[in-house]
């Protein structure tokens, strides 16, 4: 026994028990009335059915009594075995269990007890329900509904359509300055574009340019407007807006920034690095450097390229020289790759970006992806570092903050970013890395806010491009390429693979097969070898060039009539840049993609979602390849031997 008795307040529970008893009595009276009503309406049962019902009721009563006796015995045994200290808690738990709703078995037992009482008060010989099981089920339903009447039943809600969440883009992204896609029908004479100086107009005519493409006609005046007040200040003394350009490959983006930058720097007096163009590959940097050199020829402006093709010391000499113990810049415009640029910022003390006015980022989507090198943050740090200058220096630069009267006095040289890409991202996390200032977007598509389901990247396909996909098996891919070159005469053709090893194996296979000149273009080759290969391909000496994505990104290769995706690209950006090597400057071009059966569904959906004007199916009948199969099998055996020998050489 417990040492102290604890009287617990159980008033609410006792009140609930009394309420339940009164409720059951009312329900019993209601059931009796229903039995009388049904007895008057239904047809009287036969004596045999009545006997069966009576036997069924007695059987259930005996079964119920047996269960009750067993339960009492178990309870008595459990009470004897329990500790005295647990008696108070167990009694409270028993009372709490009474609050639970009645189970269906208990309800049926109550119905049977009510029926036995009804037999005494109701004439059994009268008509009863047609089925005792149906009668019990109805009673059970009534009892359960009455026992749960105190609880609020949830449900009955109308299904509503889920409202889609629309992306909310910044105004500069959602409302860009629209550029016409059709190049041929929107050519503008160079004399009609305002702001270009006569010297550059003559230079353009000398280089055979009589008209500007739509991108050039829109972007050149916008950049020239930002330098209308000179290099030291922006329009009205404010910092100029950054410029972003999203246009198809081959639409003339390079000339769109070369012309205004050269004109803006043509009036400079002291030579300093005032324009920096950063590009992802050495070949693309070489191409941009050549364009800058073509339009600075005959002027005092100097263009220097730092991509690692020369030694670090040679590049250091080209960038600056020491005269009278003082370092002097030898470059006005620097064209660089990110890795080499970071090397000069950290290791070349005479390399200064303190006077930088234009930061040009070409192939901006790929440059954003390479931010892990932190090249942009290091460039910004180098621009606003002022070693050896006092706080009262006229040309000192500080990191720009909020626009206030104090921050604008005294004025400082602004840094303007110029971004160019065929696949400009709309991902806010990536754009945040660029730290753009009130950017102005020039795009060949309209606002994207009307289509919230569209991806976060905007893609532009060349106007004259015809796209096809070729269903095939893995073993038939080389045969189809040979069929295209030898039978259909699709040349010059640029073929893309997903790996450097794949490009090399395909190159060896086509070379062993014979009948067509082939070359490979990958990072495996030296810069000199790649430059020579490109020149031979442009001259028509090589009808088939097999390349990787990294090597050919953004390069303007003249005369490419056909692009073949030997390996299907995994990402839409890769596909856009591959097919962008043809159909450039408004010309026509073909693009073929070899697809395995498992790749078709995903690839076609990816291209369709990106806004492709339409990709068609191109069948290659097996009969067209049979004549080459015997020679192809011999070549495969030879290829296996050559690859094995090359792998053995790599080990030693």
UniProtKB/Swiss-Prot annotation:
Segments of this protein annotated with the region Disordered: 1-145
Intervals of motif DEAD box: 362-365
Bias (Basic and acidic residues) ranges: 66-77, 107-122
Reactions this protein catalyses: ATP + H2O = ADP + phosphate + H(+)
Domain Helicase ATP-binding: 234-442
Sequence ranges assigned to domain Helicase C-terminal in this UniProt record: 480-626
Record field: compositional bias (Low complexity): 25-34
Sorted UniProt keywords: ATP-binding, Helicase, Hydrolase, Nucleotide-binding, Nucleus, Ribosome biogenesis, RNA-binding, rRNA processing
Entries under Pfam families matching the protein: DEAD, Helicase_C
Binding site for ATP: 247-254
GO CC terms of this entry: nucleolus; nucleus
Covalent S-S links between cysteines: none
EC number(s) per entry: 3.6.4.13
PROSITE patterns, alphabetized: DEAD_ATP_HELICASE, HELICASE_ATP_BIND_1, HELICASE_CTER
Residues passing through the membrane, by range: none
CDD domains: DEADc_DDX51 (cd17956), SF2_C_DEAD (cd18787)
Annotated localization: Nucleus, Nucleolus
Motif Q motif positions after renumbering to this chain: 212-220
GO terms of molecular function: ATP binding; ATP hydrolysis activity; RNA binding; RNA helicase activity
GO BP: rRNA processing
Biological function: ATP-binding RNA helicase involved in the biogenesis of 60S ribosomal subunits.
Comment text on domains: The Q motif is unique to and characteristic of the DEAD box family of RNA helicases and controls ATP binding and hydrolysis.
Family: Belongs to the DEAD box helicase family. DDX51/DBP6 subfamily.
Name under which the protein is recorded: ATP-dependent RNA helicase DDX51
Species annotation: Danio rerio (Zebrafish)
Lineage of origin: Eukaryota, Metazoa, Chordata, Craniata, Vertebrata
């Amino acid at each position: 026994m417990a040492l102290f008795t604890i009287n617990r307040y159980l008033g609410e529970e006792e009140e609930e028990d009394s309420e339940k008893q009164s409720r059951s009595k009312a329900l019993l009276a209601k059931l009796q009335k229903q039995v009388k009503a049904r007895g008057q309406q239904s047809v009287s049962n036969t004596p045999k059915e009545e006997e069966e019902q009576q036997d069924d009721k007695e059987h259930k009563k005996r079964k119920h009594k047996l269960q009750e006796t067993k339960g009492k015995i178990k309870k008595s045994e459990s009470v004897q075995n329990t500790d005295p200290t647990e008696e108070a808690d167990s009694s409270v738990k028993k009372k709490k269990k009474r609050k639970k709703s009645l189970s269906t078995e208990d309800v049926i037992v109550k119905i049977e007890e009510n029926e036995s009482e009804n037999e005494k008060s109701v004439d059994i010989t009268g008509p009863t329900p047609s089925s005792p099981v149906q009668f019990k089920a109805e009673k059970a339903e009534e009892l359960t509904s009455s026992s749960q009447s105190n609880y609020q039943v949830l449900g009955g809600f109308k299904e509503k359509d889920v409202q889609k969440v629309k992306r909310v883009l910044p105004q500069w992204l959602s409302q860009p300055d629209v550029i016409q896609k059709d190049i041929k029908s929107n050519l503008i004479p160079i004399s009609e574009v305002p702001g270009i100086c006569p010297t550059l107009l003559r230079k353009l005519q000398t280089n055979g340019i009589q008209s500007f493409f739509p991108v050039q006609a829109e972007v050149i005046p916008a950049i020239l407007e930002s330098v209308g007040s000179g290099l030291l200040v922006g329009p009205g003394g404010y910092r100029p807006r950054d410029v972003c350009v999203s246009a198809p490959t081959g639409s003339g983006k390079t000339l769109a920034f070369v012309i205004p930058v050269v004109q803006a720097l043509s009036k400079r007096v002291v030579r300093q690095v005032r324009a920096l163009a950063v590009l992802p590959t050495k070949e693309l940097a070489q191409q941009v450097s050549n364009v800058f050199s073509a339009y600075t020829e005959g002027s005092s402006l100097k263009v220097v390229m730092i991509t690692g093709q020369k030694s670090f010391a040679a590049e250091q000499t080209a960038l600056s020289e020491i005269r009278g113990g003082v370092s002097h810049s030898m470059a006005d415009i620097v064209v660089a790759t990110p890795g080499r640029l970071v090397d000069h910022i950290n290791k070349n003390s005479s390399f200064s970006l303190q006077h930088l006015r234009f930061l040009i980022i070409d192939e901006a989507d790929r440059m954003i992806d390479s931010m892990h090198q932190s090249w942009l943050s290091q460039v910004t740090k180098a621009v606003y570092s002022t070693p050896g200058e006092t706080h009262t220096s006229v040309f000192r630069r500080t990191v720009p903050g909020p626009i206030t009267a104090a921050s604008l006095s005294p004025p400082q040289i602004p840094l303007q970013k110029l971004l160019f890409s065929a696949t400009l991202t709309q991902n806010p996390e990536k754009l945040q890395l660029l730290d753009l200032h009130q950017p102005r977007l020039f795009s060949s598509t309209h606002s994207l806010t009307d289509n919230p389901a569209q991806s976060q990247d905007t893609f532009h396909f060349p106007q004259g491009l015809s796209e096809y996909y070729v269903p095939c098996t893995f073993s038939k891919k080389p045969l189809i390429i040979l069929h295209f070159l030898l039978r259909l005469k699709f040349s010059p053709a640029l073929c893309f693979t997903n790996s450097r090893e794949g490009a090399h194996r395909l190159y060896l296979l086509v070379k062993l097969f014979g009948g067509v000149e082939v070359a490979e273009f990958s990072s495996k080759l030296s810069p000199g070898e790649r430059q020579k290969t490109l020149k031979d391909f442009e001259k028509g000496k090589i009808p088939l060039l097999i390349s990787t994505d990294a090597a050919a990104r953004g390069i303007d290769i003249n005369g490419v009539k056909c692009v073949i995706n030997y390996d299907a690209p995994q990402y839409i950006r890769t596909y856009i840049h591959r097919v962008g090597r043809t159909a450039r400057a408004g010309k026509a071009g073909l693009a073929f993609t070899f697809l395995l059966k498992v790749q078709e569904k995903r690839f076609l959906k990816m291209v369709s979602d990106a806004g492709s004007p339409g990709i068609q199916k191109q069948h290659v009948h097996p009969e067209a390849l049979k004549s080459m199969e015997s020679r192809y099998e011999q070549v495969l055996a030879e290829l296996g031997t050559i690859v094995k020998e090359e792998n053995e050489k790599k080990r030693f």
